[in-house]
Design a protein with these regions (language model features):
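Short coil/turn linking the two alpha-helices of tandem helical-hairpin repeats
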Residues: 145-146, 150-152, 194, 212-224
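Amphipathic alpha-helical repeat scaffolds of TPR domains
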Residues: 138, 204-218
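Elongated scaffold/linker segments in the mid-to-C-terminal portions of large proteins
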Residues: 41, 80-82, 89-97, 251-444
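Membrane-proximal, proline-rich intrinsically disordered regions
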Residues: 17-64
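Beta-propeller blade signature
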Residues: 238-239
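Conserved, well-structured interaction surfaces
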Residues: 38-58, 78-148, 164-197, 330, ...
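Sec-dependent bacterial lipoprotein signal peptides
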Residues: 1-15
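Short coil/linker segments at helix-helix boundaries
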Residues: 151-172, 220-233
Length: 448
């Protein structure tokens, strides 16, 4: 009997040891926190997912890119049901806002930050990845705070029992202060060159401090809040650091928004890369069809300076006046011409809806901006006359929708067709979005 008892005891002991060992083994078919955050490359792989916060030109073909603008006063979308919800007083505050009040991304950043100290990284490497995590978390908090003001500040991954789930919102003062402190830490401790080309580095962090400090500083100044100078000073200091490393602006201006490759382009600090069959957008195609219905307002056009740098209301601006669109566009800042299509007229050599050829009219006014755009824009960028996504010419701008030329594309209700993202070199054949022009995220011109 003793033999049996001893044998059972030995088996139980061995089974206990085996079970303990089995329970301590990490699964080999999926990542856990213990395996996902161990080496430098682990953190690098995880951090790639955080870059998805940059919207760029969006994915596929949708109009979300312009939503903030046509809900403001710079643009309209001439489609029933898409009028400015603020101008028409139809805006509603939803009880649950999953688009803006979204802490899932904060949790993703906190998950990485919580696992840095327990990793096998060197202290310098830990500082780098802590800086990357701080950058992305601050970027998201900046977005949420700008919408809501007072919000909860969460620094660690929460559980179902975490008291923070039921805590009141933290003050804007606290959140704003924490955002700035996180970014300033990141600027001091991140690897200067980041993790290679087009990754978060010291210049990108300082570019965000510049943007954030200006926003928060001016908000506080004009809303009577304290510490405005703290944020404005931080913006200036960060801007100066960026300008020390970036000294040249790229020209022509329109290439910044219509290039297939922004790597190495002067003044581009960070951009979103698009690649065929991997990540595409439909912005260029929408501009070259009748689908977007996006156009600029007269107020937005009037905000552009004249060629001598003066606003149109200045007596010395030499503004041509409002007698016709040619006068409105003469001697203006070139950025207007790259954003709103200048006026022109040609004679088509084929049918109005399918002409692949044209002839000049011989009228100097009709050809004024055809000649100018040929001088200041590249061959496949903002040249006149314009082409739709199938390569058919439009005979005239402004092309009012009321003209009923059997061509709905490149048209507008008010005469100011927005063509900033127009080019004829990116693929526009597919309505699901196959455009691959890169989207600038941080530019030197914003810092200046």
């Amino acid at each position: 009997m003793k033999k049996y008892i001893m044998s059972i005891g030995i088996c139980l002991c061995m089974a206990s040891c085996l079970n303990d060992g089995f329970l301590d083994v990490d699964p080999k078919d999926r990542q856990t926190e213990a395996t996902a955050f161990s080496t430098y490359d682990n953190f690098k792989t995880y951090a790639w997912g955080l870059y998805n916060i940059f919207y760029g030109y969006g994915n596929d073909q949708n109009m979300n890119y312009f939503e903030d603008e046509y809900n403001a006063d710079n643009m309209i979308r001439a489609v029933s049901g898409f009028e400015s919800q603020y101008a028409y007083q139809t805006a509603r505050v939803e009880a649950t806002d999953t688009e803006h009040w979204d802490y899932k991304y904060i949790r993703r950043a906190n998950l990485m930050l919580d696992n840095i100290d327990g990793s096998s990284l060197t202290e310098t490497e830990k500082e780098h990845w802590r800086s990357v995590g701080y950058f992305f978390r601050a970027y998201k908090y900046f977005m949420i705070m700008s919408d809501f003001g007072d919000i909860p500040w969460i620094e660690h991954v929460l559980t179902d029992e975490s008291p923070e789930l039921y805590a009141p919102r933290d003050s804007r003062d606290l959140v704003a202060k924490n955002i700035l402190e996180n970014l300033q830490y990141a600027a001091q401790h991140i690897k200067a060159e980041g993790d290679g080309e087009n990754t978060i580095n010291a210049d990108v962090v300082n570019a965000l401090i510049s943007r954030y400090g200006l926003f928060e500083g001016t908000w506080r100044k004009y809303h009577g809040l304290q510490d405005a100078e703290t944020y404005l000073r931080a913006s200036v200091e960060a801007s100066e650091k960026v300008m020390a490393n970036y000294t040249t602006l790229h020209t022509p201006y329109d290439e910044l928004f219509n290039s297939e490759d922004l790597s190495g382009v002067e003044g581009i600090i960070l951009y979103k890369k698009y690649e065929t069959a991997q990540l595409c957008h439909g912005l260029t195609r929408m501009v070259r069809t009748g689908e977007s219905k996006i156009e600029m307002t007269k107020d937005a056009v009037d905000s552009y300076l004249c060629s001598n740098g003066l606003p149109i209301g200045n007596v010395n601006s030499q503004y041509g006046g409002d007698k016709d669109v040619y006068a409105q566009f003469t001697d203006r800042d070139y950025r207007l011409y790259f954003t709103v299509c200048p006026p022109y007229r040609v004679n088509l050599t084929g049918a109005a809806a399918t002409s692949t050829g044209y002839e000049l009219t011989g009228n100097a006014q009709d050809e004024q901006f055809i000649n100018l755009m040929a001088q200041i824009s590249g061959e496949t960028y903002h040249r006149l006359p314009t082409l739709n996504f199938k390569g058919f010419y439009v005979k005239e701008q402004p092309h009012f929708t009321s003209y009923n030329w059997s061509t709905a594309w490149n048209a507008s209700e008010m005469g100011f067709w927005m063509w900033k993202y127009y080019n004829i070199h990116t693929d526009c054949t597919n309505a699901t979005g196959v455009n691959t022009t890169d989207a600038p995220l941080f530019r030197l011109v914003e810092i200046l």
